[in-house]
A protein has these predicted regions:
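C-terminal alpha-helical interaction appendages
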Residues: 1-149
């Protein structure tokens, strides 16, 4: 068994959940085994402490998941994907969205520079709406100039 596959099979529930989340949303930490293990261990500790404090399993799980995903709710990829999916369904076919977003992401990376995507409440802030609008404009300009490649 290769090292990567072995490391995956050794991950806890929280580690596997986090790895899936990081990969699905294209976070750079997806390749950082130490980061994943530390976060997973911390989430397990939060769960255990919450249970010792007499919280119900559901409440303990909620606290553990919050600790696991702290600062990892919003990725550049997932926000841009949402923009393309929601605002450009006629221009970019569903089967082309992932490739289109992957192509476009480095071109619009500077748009994200003034926003704190690690804020777990970012989606409820006016900044989220502003970022969404800026990305929508950037995508529209790209499509107008280059089409959908």
């Amino acid at each position: 068994m290769n090292r990567k596959k072995q490391a995956q099979t050794e991950l806890s529930y929280y580690g596997l959940y986090l790895l899936h989340h990081l990969r699905e949303n294209r976070f750079p930490q997806a390749n950082d085994a130490d980061f994943i293990r530390e976060r997973a261990d911390h989430a397990a500790e939060v769960y255990e402490q919450a249970r010792r404090d007499a919280l119900f399993a559901d409440a303990a799980q909620e606290l553990a998941m919050a600790a696991l995903l702290k600062g990892l709710r919003f990725s550049k990829y997932s926000i841009l994907y949402d923009v393309v999916d929601s605002e450009f369904p006629l221009e970019v076919a569903v089967e082309d969205q992932e490739a289109f977003v992957n192509h476009l992401l480095p071109l619009v990376d500077n748009v994200y520079s003034i926003y704190d995507l690690t804020d777990d409440n970012f989606a409820q802030s006016p900044d989220y709406d502003q970022l969404y609008t800026e990305l929508t404009g950037a995508v529209a300009l790209f499509i107008e100039s280059n089409g959908v490649q």
